[in-house]
Curated annotation (Swiss-Prot):
Catalyzes the phosphorylation of (R)-mevalonate (MVA) to (R)-mevalonate 5-phosphate (MVAP). Functions in the mevalonate (MVA) pathway leading to isopentenyl diphosphate (IPP), a key precursor for the biosynthesis of isoprenoid compounds such as archaeal membrane lipids. The active site is at 164 (proton acceptor). GO terms for cellular component: cytosol. Pathway: Isoprenoid biosynthesis; isopentenyl diphosphate biosynthesis via mevalonate pathway; isopentenyl diphosphate from (R)-mevalonate: step 1/3. It catalyses: (R)-mevalonate + ATP = (R)-5-phosphomevalonate + ADP + H(+). The keyword Nucleotide-binding applies. GO terms for molecular function: ATP binding; magnesium ion binding; mevalonate kinase activity. The lineage of its organism: Archaea, Methanobacteriati, Methanobacteriota, Thermococci, Thermococcales. GO terms for biological process: isopentenyl diphosphate biosynthetic process, mevalonate pathway. This is Mevalonate kinase. ATP binds at residues 113-123. It is found in: Cytoplasm. Belongs to the GHMP kinase family. Mevalonate kinase subfamily.
Length: 337
């Protein structure tokens, strides 16, 4: 029976611990969270790739109208960028399946804000690979889907650690160091992600930290070493058989310390700090930046306090997303035959 349509989904990711220090060979822990991008794929008879984007979230899109023009005040290009990943993903899978001329229509809806540092590009690439490979009769494991997702990022961006597509494809917790991935045991984490509505340039922030590090290695080296040790401590806690409450408390403390160290590197902003402190005041056990900083998102660990923390983030001017760790990575939602 040939397949007519496939719907696949893939989750967003957050860096739990170790952003920036990971650039210096230290470990990092990332996790998939329960915000998903859905991609459905079906054949068309034009031979072309057709992409329908129904709902790509670009929060903060501002449009002004004057008598004779329409002006986009915010970065509309970010939504268009996503399409580059989709196209590349389809082309790669068509090559793998050896059916280059087949017309495919994909349709995208997403719960993941674009440009927020939550891996929206990787999620759309991974979900596209999942849907299109199944449509073309390729049986790929989630690990193989992640590897193809990494290839897509390399082709589109020119550089990629592979963290985002690996986490999105496999789900759960991933420990990463110097190109090596390790899947950690699963644990529930009740989280609230807070989006500032703006994004920093990862490239510029990494370059700024590098410059400071080169100017004052004796000051920056201990900060980066502390970050590395903190990640290993977090891994110890996640893999331990301590009771849940104790795990939450220790991870919360480590989050707060990690945020302080990131602040010392100079990658926080006034808005990120406001969201972090609002979350802590509302009862979060820990809150920190996730990702490169300079904008983007923070996240808070808030067992039993998710709605209070979400309200506090809103009052502080952020966009809250109540979520949890996603045990599953890419998954096939439905297949129409």
């Amino acid at each position: 029976m040939s397949v007519k349509r496939v719907l696949a989904s893939a989750p967003a990711k957050i860096i739990l611990f170790g952003e920036h220090s990971v650039v210096y060979g230290k470990p990092a822990i990332a996790a998939a969270i329960d915000l998903r991008t859905y991609v459905s794929a079906e054949f068309n008879d034009t031979g072309a790739i057709k992409i329908e984007a129904h709902d790509i979230r670009t929060p903060g899109l501002i449009v002004s109208f004057t008598e004779d023009s329409i002006y986009f005040e915010s970065d509309y290009g970010k939504a268009a960028e996503v399409l580059g990943y989709v196209r590349q993903a389809i082309e790669l899978v068509r090559e793998e399946a050896d059916v280059n001329g087949k017309g495919i229509t994909v349709s995208i809806t997403s719960q993941i804000p674009v440009g927020a540092g939550l891996g929206s590009s990787a999620a759309v690439a991974v979900a596209t690979i999942g849907a299109v490979s199944r449509l073309l009769g390729l049986e790929l494991s989630n690990e193989e889907v992640g590897k193809l997702g990494h290839k897509v990022e390399l082709l589109v961006q020119g550089a990629s650690s592979g963290i985002d597509p690996t986490v999105s494809a496999i789900g759960g917790f991933i420990h990463y160091q110097k190109g090596k991935f390790e899947h950690l045991p699963f644990m529930e984490l009740p989280l609230v992600v807070g989006y500032t509505g703006s994004s920093g340039s990862t490239k510029e922030l990494v370059a700024m930290v590098r410059k400071n590090y080169e100017e004052m290695p004796e000051i920056f080296e201990p900060i980066l070493n502390s970050m590395g040790r903190l990640v290993e401590k977090a891994r110890e806690v996640i893999t331990s058989d301590l009771d849940r409450e104790l795990k939450f408390q220790t991870l919360g403390k480590l989050m707060n310390i990690n945020h302080g160290l990131l602040d010392a590197l100079g990658v926080s902003t006034k808005k990120l700090s406001e969201l972090v402190y609002a979350a802590r005041t509302a009862g979060a056990l820990g809150a920190k930046i996730t990702g490169a900083g300079g904008g983007g998102c923070m996240y808070a660990l808030a067992p039993g306090k998710q709605s209070e923390v979400a309200t506090a983030i809103t009052i502080a001017g952020g966009t809250p997303m109540i979520t949890k760790i996603s045990r599953e990575g890419m998954r096939i939602e439905e297949v129409e035959e």
